Amino acid sequence: MLGYTGTYKGKRLSVQGTGMGIPSFSIYATELIKEYQVKTLVRVGTCGAMQKEVEIGDVVLAQAASTDSSLIRNIFGPAIAFAPTADFTLLYTAYNQAVNTGLKVRAGNIISVDRFYDEEIDNDKLTDFGILAVDMETAALYTLAARYKARGLALLTVSDHLITGEHADADTRQTGFNDMIKTALETVTSLEGMP
């Protein structure tokens, strides 16, 4: 998996591919934190919308991430349902950055799932409980950030809609992803003293 280190507006930062899903993401995130002392992790990726008002191309800031993965149960056991959440400073800064640049942004809860094609999951119930979108990594990001006292945030561009069946075309993907990545870069570099 490729990773790069460079500068943005004079500030040093790294970009790292993490693969797909919680197991792959967990390996890369853990090694970044433990081996390289990374203290701020921002995931940029895609998600599938689960609310009618969330549209293709919208940016979703994951405030918290439920999961069907055994990740949390393996750490806490069956008695505790740990709620993995974003770092508030990152979330607040990214939200304001997105709004100020005219992006259509939504902040709220998502779900990170283990299977891309999952016919058993009750999407209607998740929608009724206000879940905005689905991805496959954010719960791991927030859980590992909490475990290792790092900061975590996921910015996700809606590429597919689970309710309407819509999919982003190539132009929407390119433009939307660029806007999301710029928001992430501006967020990280705007915070003074953030490692």
Q: For each predicted feature, which ranges?
A:
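Metabolite-binding pocket within alpha/beta catalytic cores that recognizes anionic/polar moieties
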Residues: M1-P84, F88-Y92
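Short glycine/serine/threonine-rich phosphate/pyrophosphate-binding segments
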Residues: P23-S26, M136-L141
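Short glycine-aspartate micro-motif
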Residues: K39-R43, A133-D135, G152
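Active-site rim beta-loop-alpha module in soluble metabolic enzymes
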Residues: I80-F129
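Generic non-transmembrane alpha-helical segments
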Residues: T93-T101, L144, T183-M194
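Zn-dependent metallopeptidase/amidohydrolase metal-coordination segment
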Residues: A139-R173
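His/Asp/Glu-rich mid-to-C-terminal helical/loop segments that flank catalytic regions of hydrolases
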Residues: L162-P195
